[in-house]
Regions:
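Hydrophobic alpha-helical segments within soluble ligand-binding/sensing domains
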Residues: 7, 174-177, 181-212, 250-257, ...
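Short, Lys/Arg-rich nucleic-acid/phosphate-binding segment
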Residues: 25-28, 58-72
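Alpha-helical recognition/docking segments in bacterial nutrient-uptake
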Residues: 9-13, 17, 31, 35, ...
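Flexible loop/turn connectors
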Residues: 6, 10, 14, 184, ...
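Short beta-strand elements in bilobed, periplasmic/extracellular small-molecule ligand-binding domains
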Residues: 101-118, 212, 230-250
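N-terminal helix-turn-helix
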Residues: 19-58
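Short, solvent-exposed amphipathic alpha-helices that sit
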Residues: 88-104, 194-197, 220-239, 278, ...
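An alpha-beta-alpha
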Residues: 196-238, 342-356
């Protein structure tokens, strides 16, 4: 057993058994270090785990003390995710929250709106009011994305929760336009890096003319991905004269044909896997061969990405890990409301499948170090 885990089990066992009572001061980090022959960093990691579970609190200059059970248990958190069920990433994020040890003393109230965009906006505001009425300890909020009045609705929801003094942790995206920032913690991925990685991979495959395609009313995560896409083009000396980032439906055959004629792209980065799947169907319907004529990369790595007509190369995000990090952020926010707003960004990784044309390079002996799936 790792040393920090031994320290954690020792302290956690003392709290659970009652040997360490509410208000009791934990042994100092120096004392615990001597007891377990562990460094102060190792001890601090164990204490931080207890703090994230809401079992202890740090008092500057006074040490770490056990919280009362009334404060440590029985809290209710709201999940305000209007597009739960419509966007695949949110279900594993929520499951990550529910399964983490940090959440065991607490309850999660699931709220979703799976109707039309307009109805989803109304239902989202109603859910926020419901969480306020139930005196939720905190709310995990994934801002509306595709509704026409999404900006106004998202701001009204945030203001209502702020007035009720209910902490908010944003999931996946901010409700402010990129690169602006709200006053709330956000847990997601580094979207700029994801866009950069997707474009850089296609450039590394030999494609020089690239395009980017995303929905016109998408979340600000898409703006960040476009920024990363542009950066990769500049860094690789492939920046075109005209903007290669297009906004529109990947199912619009006229738009897709226009993009092909205007840009003659050898590779296309899609804002997400859903857009990539729709684009793939449209291109195949137009007689375009993938990846021989056009290479495609998505972002998300949803379940069906490997099952598409041409298995999709994509950027994988750790959705369960986002859920765990979001719960930890909420508990820390409750303990330290004075902390500045933070972006907690989990790493992403490239998953190589057929749509990027890597197998074409493999046949010619040019493939180096690719992580195939």
């Amino acid at each position: 057993m790792a040393k920090h885990r031994r320290v954690f089990e020792y302290l956690h066992g003392g709290i659970e058994s009652g040997a360490l009572k509410p208000g009791d001061r934990l042994p100092s980090e120096a004392e615990l270090g001597r007891l377990f022959d562990a460094s102060r960093i190792t001890v601090a990691k164990a204490v931080l785990d207890l703090q994230r579970m809401g079992l202890v609190t740090r008092r500057p200059g006074a040490g770490t003390h056990v919280l009362s059970q009334q404060r440590a248990t029985g809290r209710t958190f709201g999940l305000l995710i209007p597009e739960l069920g419509l966007t695949e990433i949110f279900e594993p994020i929520c499951l990550g929250m529910a399964r983490t040890g940090f959440a065991k003393p607490d309850a999660l109230l699931w709220g979703s709106a799976s109707a039309s965009a307009g109805e989803s906006a109304r239902e989202a505001e109603q859910m926020a009011q419901s969480f306020i009425a139930q005196k939720a300890a905190g709310v995990f909020f994934a801002p509306l994305e595709l509704a026409a009045d999404r900006d106004a609705v998202n701001r009204r929801i945030a203001r209502a929760l702020d007035r009720a003094q209910i902490p908010i942790v944003l999931l996946d995206r901010c409700y402010m336009p990129f690169p602006e920032r709200s006053d709330h913690d956000l847990v997601g991925i580094d979207n700029r890096r994801a866009g950069y990685m997707a474009a850089a991979h296609l450039l590394g495959m030999g494609a020089r003319r690239l395009a980017f395609l995303g929905e016109p009313a998408a979340a600000n995560t898409v703006d960040a991905r476009i920024a990363g896409f542009h950066e990769a083009m500049r860094m690789h000396g492939a920046a075109p004269e005209r903007d290669p980032a297009w906004r529109g439906s990947a199912q619009d055959e006229v738009l897709v044909r226009g993009m092909l004629e205007a840009l003659r792209p050898e590779g296309i980065v899609c804002a997400n896997d859903l857009t990539a799947a729709q684009l793939m169907q449209t291109l195949l319907g137009l007689g375009v061969r993938i990846p021989e004529q056009v290479r495609i990369v998505g972002i998300d790595d949803v379940k069906y990405a490997s099952l598409l007509p041409v298995p999709l190369t994509t950027i994988h995000q750790d959705c369960a890990g986002i859920g765990v990090a979001a719960m930890a952020a909420m508990l820390e926010r409750l303990e330290h409301p004075e902390l500045p707003a933070r972006d907690i960004l989990l790493p992403v990784r490239l998953v190589v499948r057929r749509s990027c044309g890597a197998q074409l390079k493999s046949r010619s002996g040019d493939e180096r170090g690719l992580a195939w799936e």
